[in-house]
Amino acid sequence: MAARFEERASKPARGPLDILRWKTRPEPRAADFAELDALRPGVQHGGATALASGDPCAVWIGHATYAFRLGGQLVVTDPIWGSITGVPRLVAAGVPLAELPPVDLVLVTHDHRDHMDLPTIHRLTPGATYIVPLGNGPRIKRANVVELDWWQSHRVGSLEITLVPSRHWSMRMPWNRNATLWGGYVVRGPEGTVYHSGDTAWGDHFAEIAERMGSIDWAMLPIGGYAPRWFMEPQHIDPYEAGRAFVALGARNLLAMHWGTFRLTDEPVGEPPARLRAWWAEHELEASRLWVLDVGEPRALTAER
């Protein structure tokens, strides 16, 4: 399959020789590695009740999966409720799938298996609207699938959803690298605006999103998946860059994601939130603006105007 979106992919691309170097020449571990690696996200059990109430709120399910209600509609991002083949889940999903209220809208940022989990998708509400970047529609196999290019928008009820750029890449199989698009989403609703970055490296797209999309109330940003840095820098931000992205976006609140659910990279499991909190304190940002939620923890979405 042709690499249709090769020119948009993050550079430099990492290939088999880079992976071999990563796996055969690991970097030395810090003295506190074991202590940080033993940490796991906290767990709460109020998420299903909060989502069913109809009030605007967000619940971290785990990894890049959030369930949030805005404009009366239940939105799920990058749904994965189970494990990845060969990679067990470290914490259970924040809301059991059987307890999740009917879903209205599913946003998938790209085709990597930890973001587009087809077994989960096939168990979600069949009548939901699925929004995906260009080329990903045929994989979803649902009736209501909408493909978007960067900066294109689609309206579902009172919500306006725009696909925005990210610095990443796509590959479902070795022969279809960059054959489908990737991105993040800006969701505008009556109560405020949510941004979900998907996977992304650092870049000037954060400032461009702020300029073109206006105020963002809740920025869902990845904070894990960054080590070793020489390998991951072109594709994943680290906790410090997540803080910089928050500032570049001009967002009001940062909702952490993409950590503590799977062991996919080399940093200790509990290191990402520790580093982000340290960066936050160093830059004297208001502590209440940083949301490192427990899995299953509901948080009200109430925008300040």
Predicted regions and their residues:
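Acidic/histidine-rich helix-loop elements
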Residues: 79-94, 170-175, 227-236
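Cap/insert and terminal regions of metallo-dependent hydrolase folds
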Residues: 1-11, 105, 111, 129-131, ...
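Catalytic core of the metallo-beta-lactamase
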Residues: 67-69, 155-217, 233-240
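Active-site metal-binding motif and surrounding structural segment of the metallo-beta-lactamase
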Residues: 85-132, 214-220
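Short beta->alpha connector loops
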Residues: 62-64, 112-114, 136, 167-168, ...
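A generic local structural motif
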Residues: 63, 90-96, 116-119, 180-184, ...
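Metallo-beta-lactamase
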Residues: 1-85, 93-99, 129-196, 217-224, 275-297, 301-303, ...
